[in-house]
C-alpha cells in the first residue's frame, strides 16, 4: 500500500478488507502471499567463482602475457639438451604471476559483495500477528507476514515490516530508527494521518519501519508493505543497482595497458617483417619454418620485455603500506585501490551528527531569574564549557568561572536536572571515555549537574568510574523519586513526584519537578523563582523569558531549549490517577518557573582547523544532515563552512526545496551548495550523481543502513566505526574514531601515496622501454640475442621490483595540502615526461646492446669478431669463407648476455636514484632521504650477484661470472644515465616549469 502514512486508520483497514480485532482470514493470507511474495529480502545473486576468475583475464596485457606463456610452453616442448630447464622456467613464471594477480583480484571482488548480505542482520526472525484463525495473538516467522496483517509490537521488538500504527497501547511509543534515518534520539510515534504524501521518513510519525527497534511502549498496527517494498528493501535495491566504478588510477593503468598492447603488437610484427629475409639462414638448418619459430620466440621475448610484470605487486604493496599508515591515524581502509582515489577527492560530503559534531548533547548555556521589579526582570545567564559527556567543565558568568552553589536558583535547577531524569553516565574503561546510559538529552542534564557540583562534593580523589555520577547521587539522596509522569506529545513535558528523604532537612514537603518544551511549560507557570522566593509571573516577565529562549533557539546557536519548573504543593499521591495520561496535564499546573537550559550537539574541537585545511587544498566540504535547516546553517557557521555573515540563500537547501527545483537547477545547486538539511538517503545518492556529472571525485560519509546506497555510489564511501555493519561493508573506508579530521588526514596520505606511485610506475615503465629498445635493436641489426625472456622476467619482477617498492616510502612534499586536487583525467605520463622516458629508455637499450657487442668486438677474453661477422652471425657455417677460423658456437656464449644483463641492472639502480624526485636534482635531494631505497638497491645488486656466482643459477639464467675489468666496463657504460637524467631535469626545472 503506497503512502499509508497519509491515510486514516479506517482507510488502511478497508484497503486490505481487514478488521483490527480479528485480522486476516487464512484465505486472505494465501492470496496476499501470492500477490506480494514472502516478507524477506532476496539473497544477492553474486557472480560465481568461475565468472570472477574469467573476469581477471579480460585485461589486454594479461591476455598478451597468457598468449606468450602458451607459446613459450609449446616451444619448450621442442627444445633439446640443456636448454629444456631454462625453456620451461619462463612459461611457468609467467603463469605464476597471472595466477597470483587473479587471486588478489577475485578476493577484492568477493569483499565488495558482502554489503548487501549484511542487510540480512536487520531482518527480524519473528513477528506477533492477529489472524482470524486464532483468538489470541500468535508468533509466526517474520517471512510469513503479509500486507494487511494486524501486528503487535512492544518494547525490545524488531519491527517485522513497514507498519501503519492503528492504536498505541501505552502512554507513549518510542522507536529507535537511527539505522534507517540517522536520527540520534528515539522518535515518539502517534496514530494521526500525516497529510503530506511526499513526507520524508523522519516526518512519517505514524509509521514503523522494518528493521527498526521499539525503545518504549506497545502498539498495534497494520502491515503496509513487506519485503523489497519496505524502506529497507528499497535501500537493498538501490545497492544492488549500483555498479562499482574503477578508481582513477585503475582507469589510467587500463588505458596505458591498451596503448602498450597496441605498441607491442606493432613492434612484434615489425621485428618479424624486418627479419623475414633471415628465415632461411643456415643457423636455422635452412628450414624456413624453424627460422619463423626463432623470430616468434623473439616476439614473445618482446612481449615479456614490454609488460611491467612487477607493477601489480608493487602497487599492491605500496597501497598496503599506505593503509597501515592510515590505520595508525584511525582510518581503516577496506578496499586497497581507494587509497589512491582519496588523493584526488574534490568534494567531501559529511554527515553532521557524530562526524562534524561529537554526537554527545551538551548544555552550553542556562539562565535563572536574578530579580523581578514590577514588570522589569533581569536574568543571570551562564555558559558552560566542555563538549562531551565527560563530567569536566566550568560554569562561567560573563566569561569568568563562578561557583554554581552560591546561586540558589542553580541549586534548584541542578536538583530538577538530576531527579527529572532516567539517564546516567558510565565510564567505559576499555575505551577510556564517558558514555551515556539512556536518552542523549537527559544525559546532557546529568553531565551538567556533575559540572555544576552545587553541593561542593569532594570529587578529586574519586576514580573515573565513581566520578561519573557523584554529584547526581548526592542530590538523589536528598529527595526520593516516587513515580514518573511519562512524556506525552500533547503536553510536551514530563515530570517526577518526589518526597524528602528521611534524613534530609533540605526539602519541606513533596515536590513535583517538571521539564519540557519551553512554550508548553511556561504556559502552565503562575510564578517564577527568584533566589528562594517565588514571585507571580506577569506578562512582561514572560515576554522577557520567551525572547531570550527565541534568541537562543535561532541565530548563531540554534540551541535546543528545555524549561525547568517545580510544583511546590502537588496534589496528594492517592488523589492522582496514574494510568490515565490525559490527566497528567492537570497535575502539571500552577508551576513555578526555575530556569532554562540550552543544549546542542557541539562541533568537534578539531573540525574547524580541518575545514580550513580542506579549503587550502581546494576541497569543498558539504554538510548533509537530517536536522532542520536553522540548526544545520548554525553549525556550518560555527565550523567555518559558511562565514559568520555570509548570505546562504542559494548555498543551503532542505531536501524538499531541492526536490522542488527543476532538474537543471538541482544539478547547478549541487555545484554551489555546502549544506543540505532535512534530507533522505535518496537525496544523498542524487547529490553524488550530480557531483559526478561535474567530474568531481566525491567522498561520502554515513553510518546508517539508509546511507549504504550513497556510500556505494560515491568514489569513496566512508563509514563510521560506530555505524551499522551494512554501512561498513558498503564503504571503502571506516573511521575508527568517527572524526571528520581523520578524513582530511587520509586525503593527505592518499595524495602522498599517488605521488610516490607516479614515481615508481614511471621508473618501471622506463625500464621496460629500455628492454624493448634492446630487443628491437638486436633483431633489427641482426645481432645475437642480448637478453632472453627468463632474464627479463627476473629483472622486471625482482631486481626492479625492490627499488620500485622502496620508492613508495619517499617523504611527502611539504606543500601537498596547498595544491588543488589533481584532475582524475590528468595523464600519468605527459608529453615531456614521455620524451624523457623515451630518451632514458633509448639510452638503456643502446647501452645494453652495446655491452653485449663490446664483448664480441673488444673484450680481452672475447672472440674479436668483426662488426660484419657479428651482424651476419646467422650465416655462420663451417663452409662459409667469411667465418674462417671462427667457431660458430661463440655466438651463443653466455658472456655477452651476462654483460648486457649486468648493464641493465646497474642502469636500473641508477634510474631508481633518479626517481627520488620528478624534477629535483640528486644534489638537492640526496639518496639518503629515502633510506629504504638505498637498502633495496643493495639487496637487488646482491640478488644479481647471486644469479651470477651461485650454482646452479648461472645455468638456468644462461649466465657466466664476470671479472674485474668486465665490471669496470659495466660501470663505465651505466653511470652516464645519471648525468643524462640530471640534464633532462635541469631543462624541466628551468625552461618548462616557467
UniProtKB/Swiss-Prot annotation:
Ca(2+) 2 binds at residues 768, 771, 799-800, 908. PROSITE patterns: ATPASE_E1_E2. Residues 1-48, 111-253, 314-757, 809-828, 918-930, 986-994 are cytoplasmic. It is found in: Endoplasmic reticulum membrane; Sarcoplasmic reticulum membrane. Gene3D superfamilies: Calcium-transporting ATPase, cytoplasmic domain N, Calcium-transporting ATPase, cytoplasmic transduction domain A, Calcium-transporting ATPase, transmembrane domain, HAD superfamily/HAD-like. It is a multi-pass membrane protein. The gene is Atp2a1. It comes from the Eukaryota. NCBIfam families: ATPase-IIA1_Ca, ATPase_P-type. Its EC number is 7.2.2.10. The chain crosses the membrane at residues 49-69, 90-110, 254-273, 296-313, 758-777, 788-808, 829-851, 898-917, 931-949, 965-985. This is Sarcoplasmic/endoplasmic reticulum calcium ATPase 1. One of its GO terms (molecular function) is calcium ion binding. Skeletal muscle, fast twitch muscle (type II) fibers. Ca(2+) 1 binds at residues 304-305, 307, 309, 796, 800. It catalyses: Ca(2+)(in) + ATP + H2O = Ca(2+)(out) + ADP + phosphate + H(+). Interacts with sarcolipin (SLN). Interacts with phospholamban (PLN). Interacts with myoregulin (MRLN). Interacts with DWORF. Interacts with VMP1. Disulfide bonds join 876-888. Key regulator of striated muscle performance by acting as the major Ca(2+) ATPase responsible for the reuptake of cytosolic Ca(2+) into the sarcoplasmic reticulum. Catalyzes the hydrolysis of ATP coupled with the translocation of calcium from the cytosol to the sarcoplasmic reticulum lumen. Contributes to calcium sequestration involved in muscular excitation/contraction. Belongs to the cation transport ATPase (P-type) (TC 3.A.3) family. Type IIA subfamily. Keywords: ATP-binding, Calcium, Calcium transport, Disulfide bond, Endoplasmic reticulum, Ion transport, Magnesium, Membrane, Metal-binding, Nucleotide-binding, Phosphoprotein, Sarcoplasmic reticulum, Translocase, Transmembrane, Transmembrane helix, Transport. Its cofactor is Mg(2+).
Amino acid at each position: 500500500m503506497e503512502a499509508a502514512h497519509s491515510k486514516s486508520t479506517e482507510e488502511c483497514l478497508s484497503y486490505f478488507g481487514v478488521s483490527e480485532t480479528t485480522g486476516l482470514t487464512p484465505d486472505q493470507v494465501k492470496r496476499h502471499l501470492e500477490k506480494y511474495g514472502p516478507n524477506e529480502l532476496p539473497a544477492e545473486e553474486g557472480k560465481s567463482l568461475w565468472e570472477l576468475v574469467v573476469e581477471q583475464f579480460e585485461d589486454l596485457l594479461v591476455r598478451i602475457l597468457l598468449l606468450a606463456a602458451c607459446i613459450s610452453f609449446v616451444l619448450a616442448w621442442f627444445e633439446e639438451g640443456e636448454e629444456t630447464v631454462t625453456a620451461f622456467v619462463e612459461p611457468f613464471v609467467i603463469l605464476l604471476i597471472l595466477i597470483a594477480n587473479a587471486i588478489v583480484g577475485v578476493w577484492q571482488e568477493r569483499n565488495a559483495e558482502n554489503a548487501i548480505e549484511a542487510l540480512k542482520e536487520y531482518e527480524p526472525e519473528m513477528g506477533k500477528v492477529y489472524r482470524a484463525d486464532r483468538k489470541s495473538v500468535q508468533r509466526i516467522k517474520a517471512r510469513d507476514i503479509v500486507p494487511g496483517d494486524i501486528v503487535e509490537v512492544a518494547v525490545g521488538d524488531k519491527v517485522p515490516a513497514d507498519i501503519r500504527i492503528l492504536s498505541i497501547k501505552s502512554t507513549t511509543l518510542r522507536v529507535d530508527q537511527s539505522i534507517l534515518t540517522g536520527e540520534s534520539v528515539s522518535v515518539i510515534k502517534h496514530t494521526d494521518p500525516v497529510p503530506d504524501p511526499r513526507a520524508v521518513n523522519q516526518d512519517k510519525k505514524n509509521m514503523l519501519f522494518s528493521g527498526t527497534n521499539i525503545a518504549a511502549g506497545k502498539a498495534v498496527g497494520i502491515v503496509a508493505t513487506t519485503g523489497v517494498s519496505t524502506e529497507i528493501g528499497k535501500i537493498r535495491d538501490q545497492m544492488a543497482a549500483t555498479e562499482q566504478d574503477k578508481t582513477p588510477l585503475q582507469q589510467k593503468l587500463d588505458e596505458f595497458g591498451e596503448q602498450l598492447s597496441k605498441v607491442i603488437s606493432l613492434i612484434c610484427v615489425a621485428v618479424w617483417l624486418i627479419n623475414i629475409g633471415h628465415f632461411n639462414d643456415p643457423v636455422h638448418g635452412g628450414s624456413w619454418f624453424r627460422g619463423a619459430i626463432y623470430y616468434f620466440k623473439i616476439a614473445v621475448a618482446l612481449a615479456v620485455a614490454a609488460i611491467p610484470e612487477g607493477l601489480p605487486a608493487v602497487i599492491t604493496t605500496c597501497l598496503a603500506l599506505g593503509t597501515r599508515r592510515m590505520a595508525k591515524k584511525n582510518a581503516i581502509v577496506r578496499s586497497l585501490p581507494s587509497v589512491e582515489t582519496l588523493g584526488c577527492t574534490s568534494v567531501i560530503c559529511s554527515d553532521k551528527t557524530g562526524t562534524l559534531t561529537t554526537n554527545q548533547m551538551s548544555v552550553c548555556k542556562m539562565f535563572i531569574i536574578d530579580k523581578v521589579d514590577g514588570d522589569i526582570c533581569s536574568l543571570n545567564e551562564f555558559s558552560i564549557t566542555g563538549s562531551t559527556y565527560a563530567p569536566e567543565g566550568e560554569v562561567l558568568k560573563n566569561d569568568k568561572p563562578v561557583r554554581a552553589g552560591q546561586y540558589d536558583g542553580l541549586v534548584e535547577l541542578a536538583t530538577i536536572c538530576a531527579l527529572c531524569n532516567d539517564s546516567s553516565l558510565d565510564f567505559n574503561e576499555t575505551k577510556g571515555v564517558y558514555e551515556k546510559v539512556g536518552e542523549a538529552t537527559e544525559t546532557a542534564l546529568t553531565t551538567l549537574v556533575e559540572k555544576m557540583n552545587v553541593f561542593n562534593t569532594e570529587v578529586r580523589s574519586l576514580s573515573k568510574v565513581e566520578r561519573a555520577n557523584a554529584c547526581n547521587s548526592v542530590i538523589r539522596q536528598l529527595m526520593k523519586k516516587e513515580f514518573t509522569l511519562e512524556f506525552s506529545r500533547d503536553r510536551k513535558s514530563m515530570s517526577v513526584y518526589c518526597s524528602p528523604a528521611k534524613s534530609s532537612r533540605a526539602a519541606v514537603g513533596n515536590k513535583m519537578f517538571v521539564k519540557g518544551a519551553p512554550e508548553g511549560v511556561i504556559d502552565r507557570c503562575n510564578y517564577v523563582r527568584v533566589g528562594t522566593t517565588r514571585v507571580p509571573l506577569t506578562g512582561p516577565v514572560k515576554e522577557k523569558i520567551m525572547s531570550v529562549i527565541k534568541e537562543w533557539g535561532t541565530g548563531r546557536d540554534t540551541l535546543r531549549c528545555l524549561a525547568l519548573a517545580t510544583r511546590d504543593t502537588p496534589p496528594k499521591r492517592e488523589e492522582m490517577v496514574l494510568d490515565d495520561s490525559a490527566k497528567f496535564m492537570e497535575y502539571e499546573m500552577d508551576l513555578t518557573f526555575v530556569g532554562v537550559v540550552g543544549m546542542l550537539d557541539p562541533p568537534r574541537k578539531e573540525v574547524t582547523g580541518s575545514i580550513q585545511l580542506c579549503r587550502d587544498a581546494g576541497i569543498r566540504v558539504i554538510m548533509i544532515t537530517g536536522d532542520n535547516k536553522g540548526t544545520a546553517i548554525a553549525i556550518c557557521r560555527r565550523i567555518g563552512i559558511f562565514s559568520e555573515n555570509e548570505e546562504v540563500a542559494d548555498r543551503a537547501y532542505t531536501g524538499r526545496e531541492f526536490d522542488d527545483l527543476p532538474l537543471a537547477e538541482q544539478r547547478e545547486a549541487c555545484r554551489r551548495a555546502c549544506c543540505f538539511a532535512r534530507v533522505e538517503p535518496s537525496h544523498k545518492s542524487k547529490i553524488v550523481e550530480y557531483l559526478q556529472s561535474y567530474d568531481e571525485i566525491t567522498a561520502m560519509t554515513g553510518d546508517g543502513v539508509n546511507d549504504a546506497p550513497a556510500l556505494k555510489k560515491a568514489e569513496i564511501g566512508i563509514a563510521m566505526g560506530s555505524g551499522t555493519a551494512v554501512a561498513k561493508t558498503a564503504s571503502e573506508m571506516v573511521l575508527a574514531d568517527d572524526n571528520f579530521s581523520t578524513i582530511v588526514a587520509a586525503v593527505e596520505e592518499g595524495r602522498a601515496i599517488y605521488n610516490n606511485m607516479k614515481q615508481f610506475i614511471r621508473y618501471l615503465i622506463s625500464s621496460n622501454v629500455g628492454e624493448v629498445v634492446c630487443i628491437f635493436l638486436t633483431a633489427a641489426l641482426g645481432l645475437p640475442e642480448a637478453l632472453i625472456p627468463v632474464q627479463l622476467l627476473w629483472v622486471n619482477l625482482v631486481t626492479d621490483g625492490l627499488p620500485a617498492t622502496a620508492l613508495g616510502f619517499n617523504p611527502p612534499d611539504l606543500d601537498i595540502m596547498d595544491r588543488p586536487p589533481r584532475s582524475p583525467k590528468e595523464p600519468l605520463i605527459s608529453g615531456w615526461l614521455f620524451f624523457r622516458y623515451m630518451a632514458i629508455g633509448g639510452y638503456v637499450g643502446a647501452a645494453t646492446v652495446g655491452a653485449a657487442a663490446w664483448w664480441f668486438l673488444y673484450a680481452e677474453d672475447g672472440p674479436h669478431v668483426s662488426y660484419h661477422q657479428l651482424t651476419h652471425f646467422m650465416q655462420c657455417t663451417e663452409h662459409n669463407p667469411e667465418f674462417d677460423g671462427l667457431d660458430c658456437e661463440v655466438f651463443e656464449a653466455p658472456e655477452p648476455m651476462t654483460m648486457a644483463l649486468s648493464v641493465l641492472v646497474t642502469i636500473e639502480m641508477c634510474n631508481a636514484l633518479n626517481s627520488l624526485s620528478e624534477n629535483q636534482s640528486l644534489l638537492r635531494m640526496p639518496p639518503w632521504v629515502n633510506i629504504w631505497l638505498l637498502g633495496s638497491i643493495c639487496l637487488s645488486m646482491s640478488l644479481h650477484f647471486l644469479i651470477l656466482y651461485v650454482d646452479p643459477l648461472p645455468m638456468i639464467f644462461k649466465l657466466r661470472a664476470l671479472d674485474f675489468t668486465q665490471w669496470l666496463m659495466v660501470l663505465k657504460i651505466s653511470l652516464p644515465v645519471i648525468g643524462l637524467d640530471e640534464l633532462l631535469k635541469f631543462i624541466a626545472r628551468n625552461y618548462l616549469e616557467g
